[in-house]
């Protein structure tokens, strides 16, 4: 329960911060993933990173495309594949959303050593949870 309440409170603070720049948390996460993926970002790859079904991600990407944050481009080498590319507006939104002031402010109650330990503990827990889910890939952390 403590983990759930803490995560919810931090997420809500982050959503409030993102609302001020006109972007949802999920859209900010998608922008981060597109930037973090080495190689072309595809809807299927984004879905894997988000632990979402492809049709759910497709809806998010459609809304982001209508907002001008991303562009879906056909892959020139593989005609049946779509690549997701950030537009200039998407790049700007990515940079504005990557400031994460709310989370930094929340973490400021911990010393640098405590923050380092927390990060290490969270990475250990994430690794174990991914193993439990039989997911064999590393996920980035900003």
Task: Report residues per predicted region.
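N-terminal leader segment of winged-helix/HTH proteins
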Residues: 1-21
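Short alpha-helical "packing" element that flanks the helix-turn-helix/winged-helix DNA-binding module
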Residues: 30-31
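Short capping segments at the starts of secondary-structure elements
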Residues: 37-42
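A short acidic, leucine-rich amphipathic alpha-helix
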Residues: 45-47
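Charged, amphipathic alpha-helical coiled-coil/dimerization segments
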Residues: 62-120
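C-terminal regulatory/oligomerization modules of transcriptional regulators
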Residues: 113-142
């Amino acid at each position: 329960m403590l983990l759930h309440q803490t995560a919810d409170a931090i997420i809500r603070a982050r959503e409030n911060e993102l609302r001020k720049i006109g972007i949802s948390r999920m859209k900010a996460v998608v922008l981060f993933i597109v930037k973090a993926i080495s190689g072309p970002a595809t809807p299927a790859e984004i879905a894997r990173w988000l632990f979402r079904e492809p049709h759910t991600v497709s809806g998010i990407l459609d809304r982001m495309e209508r907002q001008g944050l991303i562009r879906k481009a056909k892959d020139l080498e593989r005609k049946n594949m779509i690549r997701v590319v950030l537009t200039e507006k998407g790049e700007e939104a990515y940079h504005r959303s990557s400031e994460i002031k709310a989370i930094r402010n929340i973490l400021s109650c911990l010393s640098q050593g405590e923050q380092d330990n927390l990060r290490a503990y969270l990475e250990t827990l994430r690794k174990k949870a991914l193993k439990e889910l039989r997911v064999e890939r590393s996920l980035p952390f900003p």
